[in-house]
């Protein structure tokens, strides 16, 4: 990508790499109780098991898909028009919102009327919506009224990943179908640390979890383009990807490209953390083209409005920013309302002080005015805005540790307690909440973080940045944090915020975004396996079976990154014939453990004996050969 290329709305195009279907994959839609509930999944077709392994059909497997219409060949993608709006009929039929004449925030009106921005602006013809006076349009409010919304049914179907149909197809696949279904459906019992994961996710279970505050569906009424997803301890672990420009690099086009690239590889949510030029316009382009929820940190943009002087921030400026972003369709706001004046001195003893941008902004404001922040003082006013658009809180950990030296200190844990108190205030308004967490934490202190969060924040979903388990690896912090992410996901964190290799070093590009996503997909999936999430092991079992049967293309295609797997294999064995070979370049044809195992099984079958008997008999034969050869360990050639 070129540095800061000129972006023009009239010539904006989609990233061609992001709209190619993944190998041997088809986008399918599972219909719910009504025709307009169409839940996307990715169907990965497999080849048959070769006759040499006892021929059998291998039905397609189904995996969770976050790429929206971008990987659907039948969808017409034009980022200048944005995506279709599948949620709009659901929002309208509830009859609890009104269409506004246009933006109502001062800043939104100002940007709309600025002729210099015409060539950058996304030309949205739809007007923003807001709750009718006295109404609450949050998914939590509906859940507490006993209402199962289409969004709730959608995520229930999505979480089950068509598992029942897959196992049924296996049973019908041939004479060995029942045995095969049992084999592929088998998984190790997990340790869920008190989570309540059901055998099957139902719409009623989704409703009850949202009503209790243990899960959220981030879904602003002004973001009808999204395919609903759920964040909660009793659901699949999700991942968030951060994108956004800075004052020195990136353009609108590049950020839209990063978003489409992130969701291709499995980003469940995306946060736009832009701090550079045209924040408002960049966000509009991202939201209108995003099928996943979009989050922001509104204080970043508010700071730009006062030329970077934290002490000049006011409640009025911040309130206008919240309304501006809510009317654009932001699904969740990170708000650092837990940074209290009394906590700031506690950070003086730290190795790395306050490392959160939002936290440092609010700490500076508190010290400059010597009082609690307007975020804390106006928290109930913020709740009124959130429930008018169904924006979820992501209560920010402004005092998170920026080094393992500072992990689990009094500032971090004091703020956590305050976030729990704010959670209960938000719930009083039926506003959805998740809690942000650290940060940098050594492995032996990670579980304490999770246990304290569950206790003090009343089981609201936890959303953590890693945590990084060591500070010695700049350039590899996707790995140092992936270790902690897998652990804390197992203990109960609902969503993991990815870290890219560029963490602490620079703004990530597309390659870094993919590396971060894949690392965190691994961590999230490992956590699902460890928790014993029903059906989580099906993909592992399918890949392992393909590996044992030397179905190379199936191995590549079932994996998280088919392109990388195929590239690595082809570096040493590039010919098509190698895709059916019963060995790889690691061990070669004579030392492949799986090939040897297959030979043992074939020998046992021919002799009419068990595999254990075959191994014993083979050892006896080799012993006789050894004695006959002179009992020398090393034979002369």
From Swiss-Prot:
- Which GO terms of the molecular function aspect are on file? 4 iron, 4 sulfur cluster binding; carbon-carbon lyase activity; zinc ion binding
Q: Tell me the residue numbers annotated for binding Zn(2+).
A: 440, 504
Q: Does the keyword 4Fe-4S apply?
A: yes
Q: Cite the Gene3D superfamilies for this sequence.
A: 6.10.250.620, Radical SAM ThiC family, central domain
Q: What's the protein here called?
A: Phosphomethylpyrimidine synthase
What keywords tag this UniProt record? 4Fe-4S, Iron, Iron-sulfur, Lyase, Metal-binding, S-adenosyl-L-methionine, Thiamine biosynthesis, Zinc
Q: How does it assemble?
A: Homodimer.
Give its E.C. classification number: 4.1.99.17
Q: What does this protein do?
A: Catalyzes the synthesis of the hydroxymethylpyrimidine phosphate (HMP-P) moiety of thiamine from aminoimidazole ribotide (AIR) in a radical S-adenosyl-L-methionine (SAM)-dependent reaction.
Q: Please provide the Gene Ontology terms (biological process) for this protein.
A: thiamine biosynthetic process; thiamine diphosphate biosynthetic process
Which note does the record give on the cofactor?
Answer: Binds 1 [4Fe-4S] cluster per subunit. The cluster is coordinated with 3 cysteines and an exchangeable S-adenosyl-L-methionine.
- Cofactors per UniProt? [4Fe-4S] cluster
EC class: lyase
